[in-house]
C-alpha cells in the first residue's frame, strides 16, 4: 500500500515538472532602417543599428513581415525607410513583432505595388466601349455612369443598330446590283409574240408589197411566210429584220 501510494504521489517519468516550463523569449526594442522589402511576397529585412537605445558596432538583420507593420492601406516598407520596432529571438533568428515609424508614427511604405494586383490598361485593338463609344477601353472599364442605349453603327440614340438607316443604305447598292444581274434579258421573240406592246417596243411593220416580194423569192404565200416567221427561232428575226429594212430604204 505504501508503495502504491508513493507511486501515485510521485511524478510520472518522462514528464517535466510543472515549475520547469519554458519561458517565453523576452522582447527587445530596436531601431534602424529597411534593408529591403519584397512588396509581392510581403516580407523583408530591417537593418538594426541600435538596441535598447545603445548603438551596435555592426548592423544586425531582423526579419519583418507585412502583417507586423503599423500603417493603413497596402502594407510595405520602402528601402532605407527609418523604423522603430520590437523583436524577439526565435528558432529561425530575429523576428520583428511590431514595426512603426520614428516615434511610433505609422510607416510610410513603398510606392511599388505588385504587378498582378494593378489594373493594366488595355491596348486599343479597334474595340469600342459600348457605354461611351471610346476606343481605349471596354464598357466594364468605363469611368462614366451608364449612358442611354444607342446605335453601335452611327452612335445615334434614336434607334438601335438593327434599325439603322445608314447601315441599310450602305448595303443597298450591292443588293440591288445583284438583283439586276439576276433578271433575264427579254428576247426578241417575246416582242414578236406579244405584238410589240411590252416595254414600248413595236414589231417591224412590213408593207403588203414587201411581204409578197419575200414570199415570191421563197416560193410561199404571204400567209405561210408570216406563219413561218412566228414559228422561227428567236435568232432568225434578229438576222432578217435589218436586211428587210435596208431593202425598204433602197
UniProtKB/Swiss-Prot annotation:
Domain CSD residue range list: 29-102
Record's keyword terms, sorted: Metal-binding, Nucleus, Repeat, RNA-binding, RNA-mediated gene silencing, Zinc, Zinc-finger
Main location: nucleus
Comp. bias intervals (Polar residues): 168-177
One BP annotation, GO: RNA 3'-end processing
Bias kind Basic residues: ranges: 114-125
GO molecular function: mRNA binding; RNA binding; zinc ion binding
GO cellular component annotations of the record: cytoplasm; nucleolus; nucleus
Compartment(s) where it occurs, according to its Swiss-Prot or TrEMBL record: Nucleus, Nucleolus
CDD domains registered for this protein in UniProt: CSP_CDS (cd04458)
Organism superkingdom: Eukaryota
Zn finger (CCHC-type) start-end: 127-144, 149-166
Region span, Disordered: 1-27, 98-126, 165-250
Basic and acidic residues biased stretches: 9-18, 210-219
InterPro entries in the cross-refs: CSD, CSP_DNA-bd, Lin-28_RNA-binding, Lin-28A-like_Znf-CCHC_2, NA-bd_OB-fold, Znf_CCHC, Znf_CCHC_sf
Residues annotated as binding Zn(2+) 1: 129, 132, 137, 142
Residues bound to Zn(2+) 2: 151, 154, 159, 164
Compositionally biased tracts (Low complexity): 200-209
Family of the protein in this entry: Belongs to the lin-28 family.
Known role: Suppressor of specific microRNA (miRNA) biogenesis. Binds target primary miRNA transcripts and sequester them in the nucleolus, away from the microprocessor complex, hence preventing their processing into mature miRNA. The specific interaction with target pri-miRNAs occurs via an 5'-GGAG-3' motif in the pre-miRNA terminal loop.
Protein name: Protein lin-28 homolog B
Organism: Gallus gallus (Chicken)
